[in-house]
Amino acid sequence: YWVDLKNPYVTLDNNYIESVWWSLKELYKKDMLYEGYKVVPFCPRCGTPLSSHEVAQGYKDVKEESVYVTFKLKKEKGEYILAWTTTPWTFPGNVALAVGEKIKYVKVKLPDGDKLILGKDRLNVLHGDYKILEEMTGKELIGLEYEPLYNIKELKNKNSYKIIPADFVTTEDGTGVVHIAVMYGEDDYRVGTKIGLPEIHTVGEDGKFLNIAPEFIRGRFIKEAEEDIKENLKKRHLLFKREKIVHSYPFCWRCDTVLLYYAINSWYIKVSEVRKKMMELNEKINWYPSHIKDGRFGNWLEGAKDWALSRFKFWGTPLPIWRCDCGNEEIIGSIEELKKKSSKKITGKIDLHKPWIDEIKLKCSCGKEMKRIPDVIDCWYDSGSAGFAQFHYPFENKKEFEKRFPYDFISE
């Protein structure tokens, strides 16, 4: 409600939404708004992605079990490569193992005769006696094939179940070998799409395993199925080690459900394209306390990613984009434009929210009708629009807005 209690702005009002729509259309015209398929923080209970600042509100230090698992190399009898993860539920989605090209690896012989490959700097994870047989770089391991933990035909192609190079592999923890589940990690997705790994989900948006997953976990929530996944690997002599750790993990700030990093279709704002400009402007701002400038806020700007704007909810400002089956799309920037482009005359009371807005179809040049993309937008975009949307700018109060903008003082 701001300080002016006699003239509050309310984000659910049509005037406010119309100003937000105008701003989104301006971004669209500048090629700053785009649709993309990426891995985003996702709440399986709320059924929607979260923005980076929403995620930052829900981190907790949790104590849980990490696991070390052996992957059997195909061409060498009794040879395995060791990988580590804190998210065993992603194992059914495994399609590759990543190594660092310049990292040093060793092949060791264990007391039972099996041979194991892991990072040289991570030998401390081994139990008991072992003998180093060979040393090599990660580059020498690239291309080796291994047997999948689970036979899921949808995840098989010419590139899957091989050792691949990746620039994010380290020996700070784990084994120097990263298990890749393309659909459940930002780095995994980036490297997976680059080399053509299968982009197939084993988990649904509700956090439950799909029917392509192994039968014993189908239809079960990921965290509830983790123990059975570990026991299954143990019975097959693939679970090498369990280890309790404390690590920071994000939970939904609304419902306290564990978040997934989940590949999904969403609309994005190209924040990365204006990152440099935002950092320059930040230097001109007087922050109180001053450490925020180069600390919390400065660090956020430095690593700012494209903003996942879509939310898969009922309540919120609707994304004003309509699309036809032929592929044509239209973004609406005002109520007047909506009336003009609607396939039927709009009469009666206008409510820009769902479900009213989804009854509006637009005329397409192909002769068919366009339907609105059903997403709503991140409520933080509504909040960030207050500077202009409270005045119903640019439809009203232009002078009032221009007199105040840019604002001299912002209290957060």
Give the location of each predicted region.
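Residue patterns forming the tRNA-binding/recognition surfaces of aminoacyl-tRNA synthetases
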Residues: 1-92, 143, 153, 168, ...
